[in-house]
Structure formats: structure tokens, C-alpha cells
Amino acid sequence: MDADSDWRSAPFRQKLVSQIDEAMRKAGVAHTKSSKDMESHVFLKAKTREEYLSLVARLIIHFRDILNKKSQAAATDPMNALQNLTGTAVVGGQGMGMGVRPQGAQMGAMSGMAQMAQQMNLPGQPQPGASGMAPHGITGVAAGNQATQLQLQQIAQHQQQQFQQQQQQAALQHQQQQFQVAQQQQFQVVAVAAAQQQQQQQQQQQQQQQQVQQQQQQLQAAAQQQHILKLQLQQQQNQQQQLQQQQQQQLQRIAHLQQMQQMQQQQQQQQQQQQQQQQQPPPQQVMQLQQMQQQQVAQSQQQQLLSTQPQAPSLVAQGQIPSQVMPVTLTPQQQQQLKILQQVRAQQQQQAQHQAQQQAQQQAHQQAQQQAQQQAQQQAAQQQAQQAAQQAQQQAQQAAQQQAAQAHLAAGQVTQNSIPVMSSPSPVQQVQTPQPMPPPPQPSPQPSQPMSQPNSNVSSGPAPSPSSFMPSPSPQPSQSPASARTPQNFSVPSPGPLNTPGNPNSVMSPASNNQSEEQQYLDKLKQLSKYIEPLRRMINKIDKNEERKKDLSKMKSLLDILTDPNKRCPLKTLQKCEIALEKLKNDMAVPTPPPPTVPSTKQQYLCQPLLDAVLANIRSPVFNHSLYRTFMPAMTAIHGQPIASQLVVPRKRKFEEDERQSIPNVLQGEVAKLHSKFLVNLDPSHCSNNGTVYLICKLDDKNLPSVPPLQLSVPADYPDQSPLWMDNPRDYEANPFLQSVYRYMTSKLLQLPDKHSLTALLNTWAQSIRQACLSAA
């Protein structure tokens, strides 16, 4: 069993109960509780071994104190005790045995008892120290009573034993107290050490918690930084994507512009080449004709050899044979046909050279007529070039649609059509055909001049009508000029009427209409480009308005039509868009384009850009507001506040006395137009004999503090002269706030122009008070 819990055991408690019982018995105290009850009460009250032992020790000491008090009371009267002992020896002995004295009292009693014994043993002989005892009546005691002597000796021995026991108990108690004090000190030291350790542990725990919190804060800061970095990266990626999209859009626009420029350059080059060809002599025309024929022959051969599907028939130059699309695979018969075509084209080239020589001989006689027809031929050549280009596109689409119908007709058939170039009929043209042919075009004095176009197989020869390219349902065998020289006959569709440049009765083909519509579309789109920016502003303005969602969708579709080149709409739709934009013109505030300026040879005026800007925006509904907002501050700084004058000229008075009024009309009108916070009255302390008006102005503004009124003098020739402030420094020396108002007022008056109005002066006064309030705050 542990030392801390052995005090709870029954033997240990029984031992202490016996000690308490012995102490009670020695003290001779009659108590209602027994020693066991007292011990159980102490046991229940104590919580530790030390507390239990200390309570039991106090109980035993209490009984011993009672015993000591009784022994002291018995020792104060020894003669009475001896008399009691002579009567009842046994009872006296018991009574003496119950008393406990201090050490000095016990020794005195013992010496007295010894002296008494000596006197008893030797009667009649006085002993030293016994003379003081005679008055107490010891002489009356029998000297020969031996029983009494024995009793006294027993009592003395018993007292000595008790004294020794008391000394031993006192020593034990002293040792126990020292032991308890030492234990308490040890417990205190241990408790202090434990408390210090606990404090250290708590401090360490707090430090660890602080470190953990710091680490958590660092982790949170790192996480926030990572989140911020992620957001920055996302923003950078979004910006890069936007930049890439913008760059792609710009590249697309640049590519579109480059294509348009290339097309324009090609058209210009074609026109220049046409003009050069018209101005060149006939030998140069022959050389160009030969080169074009050779190039087109080579191109037609490559197309026929490499084509995998039927293609649209192309227009050829004068003297060439337009051929239909060859089938996908070339048979030996088709190869022979190609050779025959090459031979025919070579013969036609020779004929063209012969005809060119004849034309050169006749050119001297035809110069007068040539000059008259030259302009008409140039226009016709340009129109035919445009028609040929558009017809080629249309025919390509038609050929793609009719691919299935022409598949069984394309095999073994080669369409040929000879176009006369010479003015006089050649032997080839004089060959008769079984089928009646349309009359050949009338020979013109000036031969039709070919028009070469780069990178195209379109020539300026006569443009056959669309019917010439469509195979007839039941083609009749006809003998072409080439068939007169070849053993084979080819079935060809009946040619339609030919329109040559020299034929004044030639009909315009649908291609010219398409070209004109294209030009009109581009012009209209360019005309409507002025609505793009106002339309965007209008869309941004009503984007958040849910009530105008329909208008918003319409506006967005209009903007897409005007800005997106990929969205192509008919010309009629574009005209409807123009009508809708005209209706929205007032809402969008579209600036009207300035009138076309006539280029002048003189030096440009210095303010011409400003005048142009004014002319461009003069019809805008916000023009006057913009002018007022732009120029009004500068004009106010130069001339001061505007003064509202009476426009109605006052009638002249009959008498001079009536002409001089007390208050001028200008001043009355200005005072009437003042803000309601300014209360203006005439100063009764001054008399205006010379026309000067003295006023007292008060400020009634709930947002500003109350200040002394302002005294003003308005001269008679106001507004030619400015009003004056009759400053009185005494009114503004009451407190620092009024002093600051006075300083600000004097400084602001110096900033006013030389000519200023009463309104400007009062506004300056209110501004000074407001500025003083701000500085005081």
C-alpha cells in the first residue's frame, strides 16, 4: 500500500483512536463523544494524510493542555494536598497522579516531599529549610506513620515517571512538528517547481500555437498570392487572346483591302493595255494576237488533259474555237480530235496573219472613219470585257448544275465556232453548210481589236449569247469552217446571233447589269458607313434597356450588314436599311458630311481646320451646347459674368427730374434674378443723391453659418463701373472664423476682373464663407 493512502487503512486509524483515548483518559475529561467518534469526524474532515495527522495531533494536545492546567492548580497548595492525602491516601495518590506540572514546580514539590520525609524519619531534629514549614501545622502529623511515607515515595516516583513521559511526548511532538514543517516546505517547494513547470509548459504551448498561427498566416498569404497570380495569368491570357483576335481581324481586313486593291490594279492595267492596243499599229496587233492565241491554245490543252469534271465553256479570242469540257478519260479518238484542233488553230493563225496584212493595206484608206469610231469601240470593248468576265462566272455555275445532263453529250463531241476577224469574207466563210446559218456580221471598216487581260482566258472578241453555250435538245449536224478541211464531222449546237464591237445593234448581256448592281451596292455601302459609329453608340446606350430588345436586335443586324464583309445582302435590302437608318438619324445624332470642298490654288487659310470642323458639326443638335461648354469659361475669365440688361429702350421723360431714378433698371433686374439665399435691401443710413445706390446684403443659407451683412455701393453708371464693397474690419474681428472669411474675401476680390457684376461679388462672398468653413473643419 502506498504511503499516501496507508492513513486510510483500519489499523492506522485504530492506532490513532487508542492514542486519543489515552489522552482523554489522562486528562480525566468527561465528553459526550468517544474517541472513535472524534477520530471518524477528523477522518471525514481531512483530505490528505498531513491534514489528518495535524488534526489528530491538535486533538491530543488539547487534552494534554487540560491535564497541565489541572496539575498546576493542584501544585499551588501542597499542604492542602498533603492533608487530603492523610485522610484518603489512595484517593490522594490518584489525584496526584492525574496532575501534571511544569518542570520547576515538580522539582520544588519533590524537594518539599523529601524534606518532609526526613522530618518524619528524625523527629525532634530540625532540618535546614524546614523552618518555613512549621507554621503550616506539620507538627500535627504522626512521625511514625510509615504508610504515609510509602505513599509519598510512590507519589514522587509516579510523578517522576509522568514527567519523563511528558518530556518524551514533548520531544516526539517537537519532532513531529519539525517533520510536518519539513514536509510542508518540501510540498511547497514541489508545488512551486510544479507551478513553474506548468507555466513553462504553458508558455511553450503558447509559443507553439503562435508559431502554428504564423505558419497558417504564411500559408494563407501564399495561397492568396497564388490566387492573385492565377488571376493575373488569366487576365494576361484573355488580353493575349483579345490581341490575337484583333490582329486576326486586322489581317483579314488588310487581306480584303489587298484583294480589292489588286482587283482595282488589274482593272486599271486592263484599261491601260486596251488603250495601248488601240494606239498600236496593226503589226503590233498581229503579234499580240499570235501570242494570245498560242497561250490560249496551251491553256486549253492543259485544261482538257487535266480536267476531271466538266467545266464551263470559256470565251476565246478572235479566230479561236471554244471547246466544251472533255471527259475525264482521254480516248484515242479524243487525242486525234485534239491534234485536229491544233491543226485547225494553226491554219486559223495563218489566216489571221494574211488578214492582218490585208488590213494593213486598207488602213490608209480607213483612217478617217477609224478616228470617228475609235471612242465607241473603246467603250464597247470595256463593256464586253466586263460582260465576258461575269458571263464566265455565270456559265461556270450553270455548267456545274447541268453536269449530269451534259455527261452523255460531252463524250465524242467538240463544239467549234469560228469567229471572223477580217473585214472581207474569207474562203473559210464561203463554205456552205447544210443548216442555214445566221447572217455574218457586217464588215466594219475598222477591224475589231482584241483586248488582252492578264491571268484570264477572256478576250474582246464577239460575245455569243447564252444560247450559244447551251446544247440544243436535238442538235442538227452542221458543217463548221473547220469541217471543210477535216474528214470528220462534229455535231455542234446551232450558234446564236453574235454581237461584235463593231455592230451597233449589239444587245447588252445580263453581266453588265450585274456589274452595275455590284457598283451600286459598293457605293451604297460606302454611303452608309457614316452610320456605323452612331449606331454602335446607340446600341451601347440601349443595351441595358429591356423594353427595347426588339430595337436592339434590329440595330445589331444593321450593324452586322454594314461592318461584316462576309454578310452579303441584296441591294433592295440595303436600300431598306438606309430608310431605317434615316428614321433613326435624329436619335443617333449622325453628323452630316461636310459639303465637298473645291480645291483652291491659293494658300490655305490658317483657321481652315476649325472652319471645317464647325461645318461638319453645325447641324448637330448638341452643337450649341458644345460651343457654350467650350468657350464660355474663357469668355467669362476675360469679360466677367454676363450682365442681363433691359432690351426695351425706356421712353424719354418730359422732365429732367424724372430721368434720374433712385435705382437703375439694370440693377433692379439683376437683383430680381439673384438666388433666394441673397437678401438685398437699401441701406437706410445712406442717401443716394448722386445716383449711387447703397445696399445691404444678407446671406440666408441653411448650409452656411450666419455672418455680418455685406454693405455695397453701386455707382450710378453701373454696369460700366463695378460695385464696391464697403468693408468694415470691425465686423469681422469678433472671432478667428470671421477673420478667415475677411481674408478670403479680400483675396478673391483681387482675382475678379476690373468690370464685374453685383452677382459675381455676392457669389464671391458666399464662396469665401464656404472656404472658411472648410478650412476650419
UniProtKB/Swiss-Prot annotation:
Task: Output the InterPro entries linked to this UniProt entry.
Answer: KIX_dom_sf (IPR036529), Med15_C (IPR048386), Med15_central (IPR048385), Med15_N (IPR019087)
Q: One Pfam family from the UniProt entry? A: Med15_M
Q: Where in the cell is it found?
A: Cytoplasm; Nucleus
Q: What is its main location?
A: cytoplasm
Keyword set, alphabetical order: Activator, Cytoplasm, Nucleus, Transcription, Transcription regulation
Specify residue ranges for compositional bias: Low complexity.
Answer: 420-434, 449-471
Biological role stated in the UniProt entry:
Component of the Mediator complex, a coactivator involved in the regulated transcription of nearly all RNA polymerase II-dependent genes. Mediator functions as a bridge to convey information from gene-specific regulatory proteins to the basal RNA polymerase II transcription machinery. Mediator is recruited to promoters by direct interactions with regulatory proteins and serves as a scaffold for the assembly of a functional preinitiation complex with RNA polymerase II and the general transcription factors. Required for cholesterol-dependent gene regulation.
What is its quaternary makeup? Answer: Component of the Mediator complex. Interacts with srebf1 and srebf2. Interacts with smad2, smad3 and smad4.
Q: What is the protein name stated in its UniProt record? A: Mediator of RNA polymerase II transcription subunit 15
Q: Which organism is it from?
A: Xenopus laevis
